[in-house]
Amino acid sequence: MRFVDEAVITVEAGDGGNGVASFRREKFVPFGGPDGGDGGRGGSVYIQADDDTGTLVDYRYTRKFRAERGKNGAGANCTGRGGEDVVLKVPVGTTIVDVESGDIIGDLVEDGQRVMVATGGDGGLGNTHFKSSTNRSPRKFTTGVKGEFREIRLELKVLADVGLLGMPNAGKSTFIRAVSAAKPKVADYPFTTMVPNLGVVDADRHRSFVMADIPGLIEGAAEGAGLGIRFLKHLARTRILLHIVDVQPIDGSDPVHNAKAIVGELKKFSPTLAELPVVLVLNKLDQIDEANREEWCQHILTELEWTGPVFRTSGLLLEGTKEVVYYLMDQIEQQRELEAEDPEYARKVKAFREQLEAETREQTIAAKEAYRAMRKAQREADQDDDFDDDDDEVEVIYVR
């Protein structure tokens, strides 16, 4: 199934049913009073998080959703039936944004969580409501209220504790395969991973966390190179970034330069995202002679001026991966405990998360608009070239 992490749709709640003007008519009661019923309420539109839904692909093909209109009232003070609600299911981790105002309508982070995005219109009033001491037979009634209309943007960000970061072919997919049950595609060419992959990592019994593998970045990603920064937003909900560095790239490139390029692209996309804790993993040690491994790794760390946590691994041979898992599990548990025990720390974390969400959203939208503008300019340039080529051609006139 195609992975789609953003969609713009329109939702329209149902209109309320109309009230009616009706009068009681029974045998021996020729002039009964008003008994017009009210109209039914229009159906509303809800969006609900669902664990069994993994992508927003359905909303790329069907973009308009409308709830049912309420039924009109009837005589004998019968209220019309309310319109059926519409419930749209989306993956857990979906943020709902009002396109016009930019306001966040809701953030669905739990299975079954539901948000109303368009409210159904109230039903109209029957003529019973307009009876008075001076007007015993009112013929007045009201029509139903229009249902709410909205254009909304659905943004999916995967929910993970740890996000993998690195160049294409650095071994991120091999690493997540080594430590979890996730089975992303693995090959010897760049951009094997085209969509985010999630894996549950079990450190010990009843101790686990979720790891996310996103497509690799290359230098210039912030300007749209490679797969660009489309998937970087999926790191916005993580607690820790795991920077995977290929110590012996197959293309002969410098691992130090590659690592610095990744950090640079991350800062360009979101300075706040770059403030997340980073754990460095020097991967693919099996590609280096054992006698030279330590010296080469130390050279990389010195050039990077790295002072944070670092691990040496071979995802292919499962060497050093368990140590990384235990370290990450300990760090995640410490963060969870602090948030539960220290309200001030929890408040700061929440503020940081809100700033990070807003920043990544703005950068993603700006990047997409820049990409569309670039594509439009390219198309216009191609059309101009075609026009010029036509002018240079020899004109042939057929005479009968």
From Swiss-Prot:
Q: Does the keyword Zinc-finger apply?
A: no
Residues at which GTP binds: 166-173, 191-195, 213-216, 283-286, 314-316
Tell me the domain of life: Bacteria
Which keywords does this chain's UniProt record carry? Cytoplasm, GTP-binding, Hydrolase, Magnesium, Metal-binding, Nucleotide-binding
Required co-factor(s) are: Mg(2+)
Q: One cellular component GO annotation, for this chain's record? A: cytoplasm
Obg domain: residues covered:
1-159
SUPFAM superfamilies to which the protein is assigned, alphabetical: Obg GTP-binding protein N-terminal domain, P-loop containing nucleoside triphosphate hydrolases
Membrane spanning stretches: none
> Which Gene3D superfamilies does this one have?
GTP1/OBG domain, P-loop containing nucleotide triphosphate hydrolases
List the GO biological process terms. ribosome biogenesis
Q: Carries keyword Chaperone?
A: no
Subcellular location(s): the record lists: Cytoplasm
Listed EC numbers: 3.6.5.-
One GO MF term: magnesium ion binding
Can you tell me which residues bind Mg(2+)? 173, 193
Q: Where is the OBG-type G domain?
A: 160-333
Q: What class of enzyme is it?
A: hydrolase
Q: How does it assemble?
A: Monomer.
What job does this protein perform?
An essential GTPase which binds GTP, GDP and possibly (p)ppGpp with moderate affinity, with high nucleotide exchange rates and a fairly low GTP hydrolysis rate. Plays a role in control of the cell cycle, stress response, ribosome biogenesis and in those bacteria that undergo differentiation, in morphogenesis control.
UniProt cross-references to HAMAP family, sorted A to Z: GTPase_Obg
Q: Which family does it belong to?
A: Belongs to the TRAFAC class OBG-HflX-like GTPase superfamily. OBG GTPase family.
Protein name in UniProt: GTPase Obg
Q: Which organism is it from?
A: Acinetobacter baylyi (strain ATCC 33305 / BD413 / ADP1)
